[in-house]
């Protein structure tokens, strides 16, 4: 069985992407959770991760252990390992676009990330709108609208895919900070929040405890 090493569900945006993909796709995995911000966190992560960060996916291939780090690389591996789950679009052009927006999410939107830290269980309406954040949000909304309109929905490329998993943290961030969207972008964000994997993640984030002052106190 696959093993997925993650951090706190409430705060670790990188961890939640492969967690949501596996959960939404119904792919069984063993979860290894390491609490962030604790005295032994670095040592615990080092037992599993060659880079010292989470997430890490652990698999056994031909009798040898395989470790994959980086959320997008993990999602790519899962999509290839389980082709029947159709985690990328079947159409070549749509698949290229899905990879493009996933990569853009992976490397971009720094203003939004910095000023709207991941925090599923708290609410900070109106906070975080620093320079550059509005432009990031506008770009996200454009991606969502164009992808859903092109594919016909309900998700970015029809059925739930790697691209949706990659945008999961932004969906939660916009909800936490009370960002109002409209039209197809708003409808997509709500469909994501209603997806079983995101509902379950939000429930677990609410219940897990282990608060992190560096996140919780930013807009307290």
Language-model region placement:
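Active-site-flanking alpha-helical
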Residues: 79, 170-171, 202
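Short Asp/Glu-rich motifs
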Residues: 40-42, 193, 211-212
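GST-like fold's C-terminal all-alpha helical module
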Residues: 105, 109-194
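A generic structural-conservation signal
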Residues: 31, 183, 201-202
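Conserved beta-strand edge residues that scaffold enzyme active sites
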Residues: 35-37, 188, 206
């Amino acid at each position: 069985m696959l093993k997925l090493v993650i951090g706190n569900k409430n705060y670790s945006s990188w961890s939640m992407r492969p967690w949501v993909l596996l959960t939404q796709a119904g792919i069984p995995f063993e979860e290894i959770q390491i609490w962030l911000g604790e005295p032994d966190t670095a040592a615990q992560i080092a037992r599993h991760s060659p880079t010292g960060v989470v997430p890490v996916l652990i698999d056994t291939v031909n009798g040898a252990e395989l470790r994959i780090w980086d959320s997008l690389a993990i999602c790519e591996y899962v999509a290839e390992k389980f082709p029947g789950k159709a985690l990328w679009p079947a159409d070549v052009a749509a698949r290229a676009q899905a990879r493009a927006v996933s990569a853009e999410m992976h490397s971009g939107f720094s203003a939004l990330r910095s000023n709207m830290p991941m925090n599923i269980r708290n609410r900070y309406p109106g906070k975080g709108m620093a320079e550059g954040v509005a432009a990031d949000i506008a770009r996200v909304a454009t991606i969502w609208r164009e992808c859903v309109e092109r594919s016909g929905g309900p998700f970015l490329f029809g059925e739930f895919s790697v691209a949706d998993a990659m945008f999961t943290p932004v969906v939660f961030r916009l909800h936490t900070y009370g960002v109002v969207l409209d039209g197809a972008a708003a409808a997509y964000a709500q469909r994501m929040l209603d997806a079983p994997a995101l509902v379950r993640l939000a429930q677990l984030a609410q219940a897990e405890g282990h608060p992190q002052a560096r996140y919780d106190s930013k807009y307290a």
